Design a protein with these regions (language model features):
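Transmembrane and membrane-interface helices of multi-pass
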Residues: 2-231
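Exposed alpha-helical structural elements
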Residues: 7, 42, 124, 136, ...
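Alpha-helix initiation and N-capping motif
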Residues: 21, 112, 122-123, 212-215, ...
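Residues that form generic nucleotide/phosphate-binding pockets
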Residues: 50, 54, 128, 153, ...
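A broad, low-specificity signal for short, low-complexity segments enriched in glycine/proline
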Residues: 75-78, 86-89, 167-169, 177-182, ...
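Short coil/turn linker and secondary-structure boundary residues
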Residues: 116, 120-121, 213, 230-238, ...
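The feature marks either
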Residues: 204, 211-216, 220-268, 276, ...
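Solvent-exposed soluble domains appended to multi-pass membrane proteins
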Residues: 250-641
Length: 641
């Protein structure tokens, strides 16, 4: 046969095919989310900037093989390598687009770094997919295998009959290919190449993510992992002294409370309760947002929590720092401010020598433990806890004959039975104790025992029914605890790690950061607290009401005192928000100027508004603080190495 095709024919063919796939996928996603795209008048920008980002992705993916194809298109070895490259690259693109709808359904974003993080735990993720998303998994696998076969055959066809190019011409064409690929991948004549921030055009984070393609989104997120130590600098820079001055000023504490020149946030703290220090238990409820709590205006799914709320100190206006469990752990056990990096539970520099209240309490003679129904290795919890003050971890292998076992571990009832058994034994041995008890039943694929609750809806395995079972288990635990010998000497905090499925047509879906928090104990007076507070205020408050004084670097407020934090920090993927009590909000997105908004809680909307420059500086200072303390290993309870 005649050799009539350009040497770059295989590249052109696969570029066109993948552009079509990108466009059809984006079109389908946009039609699915048409209301949100229309709400920001985004149709034109979505497809124009989307095409731009698709070209960027394809220049990165096919630029190198295009160069080598120009040089070695007559080589049989290179043709085989090219076929593999074209096939695997295209299968990756297709697979990521197929995975996108399910990811958006759960996280309200295209696949991002969470997609990568879950790959570290294949057992748990595979079990979850098999139980709750089997049809989608089978379809995706079949489609991917068929696509692989088709792409492989197509690549074989594409590399045939390539017209030889003279060696004199090859260097010239190679330079042209390099120039086109470089300019296409950079897609900008500015000093910085294109990135997701440059093509974001709306106040809706999901719509902004639709501009990207999912393969690019995931690989860009992977590339960002290496910069986690200084991650917050994507919001801007500030002199360290000014950052610390602003943070300290926002706390309203005298300079004499700060006791270290080396550790800038280390303070001495006197507990409000002056009796014998109490045992402390934190019950961290998986995905139990305010939307599931009747007494906070949510669905009628929490009769047990609502009853308990009348007996303790209920925080009506508390906001989580993030949307992942590790972010909730970071806030409730370490009082650490959120950053755009992964939570410190997963970061290298915080696996030992990083402050937690477990470390503080262990040094004061407490037995410290983490009690979980799943496997302790998940989300790197075991490493973080063992390295930072938790002496004992009880996980799934430690349950003998559990009543019910699901994808993510034993049921919440089994968890609380084990917790009650553990606390009773420790109390009988005369050991003061601190424990973090982390539930898991309220998690996709929403498995829990039959016959425990009256189902809220059909079918059984839904988010609402699972939340109602989680509430039932809370009631089960406190029925046991109130009859125990340790009840009168223990303070309990029931708090959610985050809400379930944080989604909304705004850069930060503030409604889905609202979570319940309730402090209970024999000496805790019932009250409803309407102050705007953050998850990071809970460990400081808990220590104070339990009678534990000490030195620590946490910047949260002690809410037993006459103070009003009047602020909440919220991290939504790479976007951070600071909200004040008057509902003024500053939102910071990577490589962009901070913007002011006002939040309408009734309508759940954010509207642009000019806010004081001081508030923007306060937002930036707090956003930078966490990265600064982490990077320089300055989040400690003392100056000891």
């Amino acid at each position: 046969m005649k050799q009539t095709r350009s040497p770059l024919y295989p590249i052109f063919l696969f570029v066109i095919i993948n552009l079509i796939i990108f466009t059809l996928s984006r079109l389908g996603l946009a039609i699915w989310q048409a209301d949100r795209v229309s709400a920001v008048a985004g149709w034109g920008q979505l497809f124009l900037q989307g095409l731009r980002m698709d070209i960027v992705a394809l220049c990165y993916l096919f630029g190198v093989p295009a160069l080598f194809t120009v040089l070695f298109h007559n080589s049989r070895i290179w043709k085989m390598i090219l076929r593999i490259w074209l096939t695997l690259g295209s299968v990756f693109i297709l697979f990521m687009e197929l995975a996108t709808p399910a990811f958006i359904e759960t996280y309200d974003f295209r696949p991002n770094r969470l997609f990568i993080e879950y790959l570290i735990y294949p057992k748990e993720v595979f079990s979850m997919l098999m139980e709750g998303h089997l049809t989608a998994v089978i379809f995706s696998l079949i489609f991917t295998v068929v696509a692989f076969v088709c792409y492989w055959k197509l690549s074989g066809y594409a590399v045939k009959n390539l017209r030889p190019m003279s060696w004199k011409l090859r260097p010239v064409v190679a330079l042209l290919v390099i120039a086109v690929a470089f300019l296409g991948a950079r897609s900008s004549f500015q000093h910085r190449g294109v990135n997701p921030a440059m093509v974001a055009f709306s106040s809706d984070g999901l719509v902004n993510s639709l501009v990207l393609n999912s393969g690019y989104s995931v690989l860009y997120a992977a590339q960002q992992f290496k910069d986690e130590g200084s991650s917050s600098e994507v919001y801007g820079k500030m002199d360290t002294d000014e950052m610390l001055r602003i943070v300290k000023a926002s706390r309203g504490r005298p300079e004499s409370d700060y006791i270290s020149e080396k550790i800038p946030t280390l303070t001495k703290n006197q507990a409000t309760y002056q009796g014998k220090p109490k045992n402390i238990v934190i019950i961290l409820e998986e995905s139990f947002g305010a939307q599931f709590v009747g007494t906070l205006g949510g669905k009628p799914l929490s009769p047990e929590f609502d009853k308990l709320a009348k007996e303790g100190w209920l925080f009506e206006n508390l906001y989580a720092t993030g949307t992942r469990s590790v972010r909730g752990i970071e806030a409730t056990t370490a009082g650490f401010t959120p950053t755009p990096a992964r939570a410190v539970v997963k970061l290298n520099n915080s696996q030992s020598g990083f402050f937690t209240i477990a470390d503080l309490l262990a040094k004061q003679g407490y037995n410290t433990s983490f009690i979980y129904g799943g496997e302790k290795h998940f989300d790197n919890m075991a490493s973080f806890f063992y390295g930072n003050g938790f002496q004992t971890i009880i996980d799934q292998k430690d349950y003998q004959n559990p009543k019910f076992t699901a994808t993510w571990g034993v049921s919440d009832e089994d968890l609380f039975d084990k917790a009650n058994e553990t606390f009773t034994q420790l109390y009988n041995e005369g050991k003061p104790f601190f424990s973090l008890v982390f539930s898991s039943s309220n998690h996709d694929p929403f498995e829990f025992p039959d016959g425990k609750i009256e189902l809220y809806e059909q079918p059984k395995a839904t988010r609402n029914n699972s939340a109602k079972y989680a509430d039932y288990a809370i009631g089960h635990f406190f029925n046991l605890a109130k009859q125990s010998n340790y009840w009168k000497d223990t303070v309990f905090l029931v708090i959610a790690d985050h809400d379930s499925r944080a989604a909304g047509a705004s850069l930060v879906p503030i409604k889905h950061f609202h979570i319940p928090a309730l402090i209970l104990g024999d000496h805790v007076a019932p009250r409803r607290d309407s102050r705007l507070v953050s998850q990071i205020d809970m460990p400081t408050t808990l220590l104070s009401i339990a009678g534990v004084s000490g030195n620590y670097p946490m910047i949260g407020f002690d809410l037993t005192q006459d103070v009003n934090p009047d602020r909440a920090f919220m991290q939504f993927d790479q976007t951070q928000a600071l909200m004040k009590g008057n509902h003024d909000v500053v939102i910071q997105t990577p490589n962009s100027k901070a913007k002011g908004y006002v939040y309408d809680k009734e309508k759940d909307t954010l509207t642009e508004k000019e806010v004081p420059e001081e508030m923007k500086k306060e937002a930036l200072a707090h956003a930078l603080l966490g990265s600064y303390l982490y990077k320089n290993r300055l989040y400690k309870g003392s100056e000891e190495k």
